[in-house]
């Protein structure tokens, strides 16, 4: 899965589906889309959404 080029939206979908039933922050992942960079854990949700969006967008 080395698609760091432009299919970021697709990666969000995968993560959203993966965490949709696992964690309660499914909506947060969807809105921020930084869950994948944050780590995916409960503590990584907020840090992923807040920091992952900016750092993630920059890396993309």
UniProtKB/Swiss-Prot annotation:
Q: What domain of life does the UniProt record list for this protein's source? A: Viruses
InterPro entries per the record? Orthopox_C10L (IPR009748)
Looking at the keywords, is rRNA processing present? no
Keyword annotations for this protein? Early protein
Kindly indicate whether the keyword Cell membrane belongs to this entry: no
Q: Where is this region: Disordered?
A: 1-60
List compositional bias (Gly residues) regions by residue number.
31-42, 49-60
Disulfide-bond pairs as recorded: none
Instruction: State the family it belongs to.
Output: Belongs to the orthopoxvirus OPG024 family.
| Descriptive protein name | OPG024 protein
Give the organism, scientific name: Vaccinia virus (strain Western Reserve)
């Amino acid at each position: 899965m080395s698609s760091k080029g432009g299919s970021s939206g697709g990666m969000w979908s995968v993560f959203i589906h993966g965490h949709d039933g696992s964690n309660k922050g499914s909506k947060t992942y969807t809105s921020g889309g930084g869950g994948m960079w944050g780590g995916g854990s409960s503590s990584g949700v907020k840090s992923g959404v807040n920091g992952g969006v900016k750092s993630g967008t920059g890396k993309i």
